[in-house]
Regions:
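Predominantly transmembrane beta-strands of Gram-negative outer membrane beta-barrel pores used
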Residues: 6-11, 18-87, 93-101, 118-120
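Short, solvent-exposed loop/turn segments at the edges of secondary structure
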Residues: 2, 14-16, 32, 75, ...
């Protein structure tokens, strides 16, 4: 057919419910020109399902950002693209032009709106091995993530953060090459896939955010122990470096979307989405009213002096200790990423279309580590220290006609760690983020022991498709 329309939906433990629609015209104006119109909406039902059952919880954080409700609002994307095959009368060439608008979220990190256009030249090097060069012009505005700017760049007053949240241009040039030599698209049993990207944004590309970014990933599949038993391995590497700010940004600020994050259903599965790597904690100042300073003096939680409060010794009005659950962890991401996984997939003989999996995921996120893009090269030990983890786990797959429906349980062996804490005060009639001088000894697993404490170390992931 010359026309095709599709509509679908689904859910997972991070994005709640989603729906998507697509319309394709395969011969627009003749010459096999292809027009694609797509739209998707996610985060549906988030307010009602927040923290219910298998779904992730967005904490009701009332500190500076006040953005807990923002993370529960729907996300959406819409795009239109026209693709010209055999461009310049070369059968391996294609040129596409498109426009888009979106409200995207990096879960628990940042929300941003954007709109713009893109131009892409694609050259097919071999079967299932395309290379492309693209330019994407986007006007973006960060909606949430005040603590990100405060801790990462020292910008803590809400007036300056407001300026950073104004519309900025994010306009990179991206070169990409990929190859697919796997035997099946949805559940490979043999072969390999690989992808590499180089990205640059600067004044030359008319971008306010300026950086160099490199990323590569690959997966290898081999049958082991039987026809439907597969050993799958996966590796991800990434580096990004800011190049300085424009007149609008006036700082070496990376867009949060261009930093690297780890943790989640397709990453290190012992952690929730983006929760492995550098993090901070946010805490409403009201919980610091009954705190003390490092010297034991009463804490002043209403002024700049709140920075001297000790977040490890706080109580409520009834003098009961305030637990770790009152602190909200927020991922900062990093400029360097290394991640590796090994997974053994096997059939369950007595249950048709059902399979099991055993896996080990490892990853680390850091700053300027093993840096091929700039100065400040550090060691692998620096990358792993404090920001890395290895998490084992197991899972079940139901092999449906639309792909594997996957349930994974990842075990988190991490212990308590020292994390920076930020809160907010009203200063001269304006809200201001204040980083505390004393870090918090924090454990996302809680302080409980026994069976309950052990079970708290498991992270559940439910999604469609293999992890890689």
């Amino acid at each position: 057919p010359l026309h095709e329309a599709r509509i679908g939906g689904g859910f997972n433990t991070v994005d709640y419910f989603q729906t998507e629609g697509r319309f394709t015209h395969y011969n627009l104006f003749g010459g096999a020109r292809r027009l694609d119109i797509t739209a998707s909406v996610g985060n549906l039902g988030a307010s009602a399902l927040n923290g219910a059952g298998i779904f992730r919880r967005v904490e009701a954080d009332t500190t500076t950002t006040g953005d807990a409700a923002d993370f529960l609002k729907p996300t959406w994307q819409a795009s239109i693209e026209l693709r010209q095959p055999a461009w310049l009368q070369r059968p391996r060439n294609a040129l596409s032009i498109g426009a888009f608008a979106q409200r995207r979220a990096v879960p628990a990190v940042v929300i941003d709106r954007g709109y713009g256009g893109n131009l892409t030249y694609t050259r097919t090097l071999a079967l299932r091995a395309p290379a492309s060069l693209s330019y994407r012009f986007e006007v973006t505005r960060v909606e949430a993530g005040g603590p990100y700017f405060c801790v990462s760049f020292g910008v803590c007053d809400t007036l300056t953060i407001g300026a950073l949240r104004s519309r900025q241009r994010l306009s990179p040039v991206l070169a990409q090459v990929q190859i697919d030599r796997s035997d099946q698209p949805l559940a490979p049993t043999r072969g390999y896939t690989a992808r590499a990207e180089l990205e640059h944004a600067s004044a030359v590309t008319v971008s306010d955010y300026r950086y160099n970014r490199a990323y590569a990933e690959g997966a290898l599949y081999a049958r082991l122990g039987g026809k439907n038993s597969v050993l799958a391995t996966h590796l991800r590497l990434g580096f990004v470096r800011p190049l300085g700010g424009s007149a609008n940004l006036n700082a070496e600020v990376l867009h949060p979307r261009k930093r690297f994050y780890a943790g989640g259903s397709q990453s290190v599965r012992g952690y929730g989405e983006n929760q492995l790597g550098p993090r901070i904690l946010t805490l409403p100042a009201q919980y610091l009213v009954n705190s003390v300073t490092a010297s034991g003096a009463p804490c002043d939680a209403t002024s700049d002096a709140v920075r001297y409060c000790n977040p490890n010794f706080i109580t409520d009005s009834a003098k009961n200790p305030v637990g770790d659950d009152k602190f909200t962890p927020r991922a900062l991401g990093g400029t360097s990423l290394i991640e590796a996984s090994v997974e053994y997939r096997f059939p369950i003989p007595i249950l048709k279309n059902l399979g099991g999996a055993l896996f080990i995921d490892g990853g680390a996120v850091g700053e300027k580590v093993l840096d091929p893009l700039g100065a400040g090269v550090k060691t692998l030990a620096d990358l792993v220290r404090g920001t890395g983890a290895i998490t084992p786990g197991f899972g079940v797959r139901y092999y449906s006609s639309v792909g594997p429906i996957r349930v994974d349980l990842g075990f988190n062996p991490s212990r308590a760690e020292d994390l920076a804490v930020v809160t907010e005060v009203i200063k001269n009639g304006r809200r201001e983020i204040i980083p505390l001088d004393i870090p918090k000894r924090y454990s996302a697993m809680g302080s409980g022991g026994g069976v309950g404490g052990f079970l708290n170390r498991f992270t559940l992931h439910l999604s469609i498709g293999q992890a890689y």
